[in-house]
């Protein structure tokens, strides 16, 4: 008999020892045992995100995190430039529309990656854009977009950059 495993969305294997850890009693967030664990997790997350700032931890899906970021940072009526190059990019465009953001949709052939060269002319055309929303690795196609060049562009322009890094986190550079 081989090892058994549980597979979750996108065929992510969950090792049995992780499943067993989930069966242990939880530590209440107001107990004296919780702060040291939380602080250690914050240190590790800051290192993973290359950040000196605290990292927000959300209990939800990747979609909930990107949607929360968009809704928290972009008000209805404000302009957002959103890359649609796959299923998740398509989702961020729908989120922008659902919340009444002024959407500039960048349609790119699925399977093609982009970088700053795609967004530079758009920022000149839409200098009032509050943010650019990009999926770093489009899971539906496997394409990795050049986040470093896009981030450099947004730093120069003062435009916010919201990155869906769900499938790229710890696999692709964040700096």
Set out the residue ranges of the language-model regions.
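Charged, compositionally biased N-terminal leader segments and the immediate start
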Residues: 1-5
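Conserved PLP-enzyme active-site core in the AAT-like
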Residues: 40-41, 57, 63-175
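A glycine-/small-polar-enriched, mobile loop at the entrance of the PLP active site in fold-type I
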Residues: 6-59, 63
């Amino acid at each position: 008999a081989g090892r058994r495993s549980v597979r979750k969305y996108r065929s992510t294997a969950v090792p049995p020892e992780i499943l067993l850890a989930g069966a242990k009693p939880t530590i209440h967030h107001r107990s004296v045992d919780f702060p040291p664990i939380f602080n250690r997790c914050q240190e590790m997350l800051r290192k993973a995100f290359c950040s000196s700032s605290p990292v927000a931890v959300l209990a939800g899906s990747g979609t909930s995190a990107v949607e929360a970021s968009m809704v928290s940072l972009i008000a209805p009526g404000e302009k957002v430039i959103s890359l649609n190059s796959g299923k998740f990019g398509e989702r961020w465009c729908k989120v922008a529309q659902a919340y009444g953001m002024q959407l500039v949709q960048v349609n790119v052939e699925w399977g093609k990656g982009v970088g700053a060269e795609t967004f530079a002319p758009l920022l000149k055309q839409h200098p009032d854009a509050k943010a650019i929303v990009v999926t770093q690795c489009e899971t539906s196609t496997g394409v990795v977009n050049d986040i470093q060049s896009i981030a450099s562009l947004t730093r120069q322009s003062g435009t916010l950059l919201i990155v869906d890094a769900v499938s790229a986190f710890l696999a692709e550079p964040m700096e």
